[in-house]
Amino acid sequence: MSNLYYTVFDTDVCTVLLVLTLNGFVCYASLGKPAIELKGIMAKDFSSLPYQLKPLSTMTGDKIEIDKSVEKFKLLVETPSVSQDIKTELLFGTPLQRKVWKELVKIPAGQTRTYKELADLLGTHSRVIGNCCGANRIAVLIPCHRVVGANNKLTGYRWGKSYKEYLLKQEGIGI
């Protein structure tokens, strides 16, 4: 069973929980709820995966890459319009979900796509795109907040519509 390391921190915007690999790849990012709730959700999400979650504070040895990723993620949450080079590792998702998430990563900051546009591009239905967005476990880095309803309508967001609206506004998108 491989170890993954998690950390919880506050930004100017919200509380964030990150799970990272030894080499600093973000494999889980959750935000917006109190730390105790974020930890509970994380434990449930990882319950069927073959990883042992450990607090980052218990890690010994070189944490340089992890620390860099954490700092970059803090900056990204506070200023999502400024691109950060943060590597991710997908531990969750079906092949279809991962295909959708790879398309989401191509949407630049400051732009949105509708569920229908993505569905047409991938040859599926809008509802499927919505379900894939809802299954995303890496907030902000897999930018499901950039997917909106028809007529640019603000729709649901796993971490709360208020955070979706905040992220879009910070990227210069008025919804």
Swiss-Prot record:
One Gene Ontology MF term: DNA binding
Matches recorded under PROSITE patterns: MGMT (PS00374)
Gene3D superfamilies registered for this protein in UniProt: Winged helix-like DNA-binding domain superfamily/Winged helix DNA-binding domain
Enzyme Commission number(s): 2.1.1.63
Protein name according to UniProt: Methylated-DNA--protein-cysteine methyltransferase
Catalytic reaction equation(s): a 6-O-methyl-2'-deoxyguanosine in DNA + L-cysteinyl-[protein] = S-methyl-L-cysteinyl-[protein] + a 2'-deoxyguanosine in DNA; a 4-O-methyl-thymidine in DNA + L-cysteinyl-[protein] = a thymidine in DNA + S-methyl-L-cysteinyl-[protein]
Active site annotation, chain numbering: C144 (nucleophile)
Key word Nucleus present: yes
Key word DNA repair present: yes
SUPFAM superfamilies documented for this protein: Methylated DNA-protein cysteine methyltransferase, C-terminal domain
Miscellaneous comment: This enzyme catalyzes only one turnover and therefore is not strictly catalytic. According to one definition, an enzyme is a biocatalyst that acts repeatedly and over many reaction cycles.
Main location: nucleus
Gene field: MGT1
Amino acids binding DNA: Y115, R127
Coiled coil (residue ranges): none
Pfam entry (one): DNA_binding_1
Keywords, alphabetical: DNA damage, DNA repair, DNA-binding, Methyltransferase, Nucleus, Transferase
